[in-house]
């Protein structure tokens, strides 16, 4: 049972700031707006600190070692595709073969990372590792505007919102990720509509 009075008393301004930055970041992504990457930088840095304080080592490393440079890379890729903020990089899908390859790459990555984290005293090492591995895949596919990246974010947001963050008593972030779960579903539907016809499949 959640003690909401205690949760509000222990509310971290840092966690609130991270949640706001992340919410804006994802909303802009749903709208296919290039400024998603700027807010992504703020979100990554703030949540990196939040996860570090909570001893979620895989998630901390994910923020600083992968997400942060990927924000710069994603920004560059989208800018290169077109000069305006509503850029011209097309929304596409993975080929069936590429989907299999990415799945086969993601699951062993999660298993290996979970095994390594089990020696570090990390909290929730296996689920943290799974979230990290799926996030790595999702972020790369997002950078290249592959519709399948929304499936990754649906899974990640569900694992964070229903399992990982509540167990660390990060209630604001838990609520945020449940909201992000809804936004990910909306983003998936919006991008499917925006993709248009005929649909294209390009390997990555």
Where are these regions (language model features)?
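Long, highly hydrophobic alpha-helical transmembrane signal-anchor segments
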Residues: 23-54
